[in-house]
Design a protein with these regions (language model features):
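Core nucleotide-handling region used for phosphoryl-transfer chemistry
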Residues: 1-172
């Protein structure tokens, strides 16, 4: 976490990325925690979740997380950045997404964190397995969404992102 002293998103981007990016690189990142004394993401009213919970579950939920969720990501009056995507734009304005492995490698070179990686699954090229593998990916994503966060246990998990990479499709 970095200090909360008067900062702007532009100052943060310059601090972390000036003179560190290759020509044509664009870095996409999420800012979490506190900026200028306020949470980056406003507290969420947990009462809106009650209709979606099992009977009796809401009371336990409120005991655990409180009436409002504060998405601080372990920061106390400070912030962190997490990179989730890096692209390269060539001289013909063709944009290419870096693979996840390349994103992790560039983050290490630049000295910044990437979003937490929960799992990495390789799906076989044998198309007869695709429906079963698709189901296993969906099951894993559902499990990750419904389980407590191991990275930030003090608050709700906001969700998970499934990134698909292959030669036939752009990463998503």
């Amino acid at each position: 976490c970095k200090s909360k002293s008067d900062v702007s998103l532009v100052k943060i981007a310059r601090k972390y990325f000036d003179n560190k990016l290759h020509k044509g690189e664009t870095v996409y990142f999420e800012l979490v925690g506190y900026m200028n004394g306020s949470l980056v993401k406003k507290p969420y009213d947990n009462s809106k979740l009650e209709p979606f919970m099992f009977p009796g579950g809401y009371g336990d939920f409120i005991k655990r997380y409180g009436k409002k969720s504060k998405f601080h990501y372990g920061c106390t009056n400070s912030y962190k950045i997490y990179v989730y995507r890096i692209t390269h734009t060539d001289s013909d304005n063709i944009i290419t997404d870096y693979s996840w492995q390349q994103v992790k490698s560039r983050c290490k070179q630049i000295g910044v964190k990437h979003v937490p990686e929960m799992n990495n699954i390789e799906i076989s090229e044998d198309t007869s397995f695709v429906p079963a593998e698709r189901e296993s990916v969906l099951d894993l994503a559902e499990y990750q969404c419904n389980s407590e966060s191991s990275n930030f246990p003090d608050h709700l998990k906001e969700g998970v992102c499934v990134r698909i990479e292959n030669e036939d499709h752009d990463p998503i």
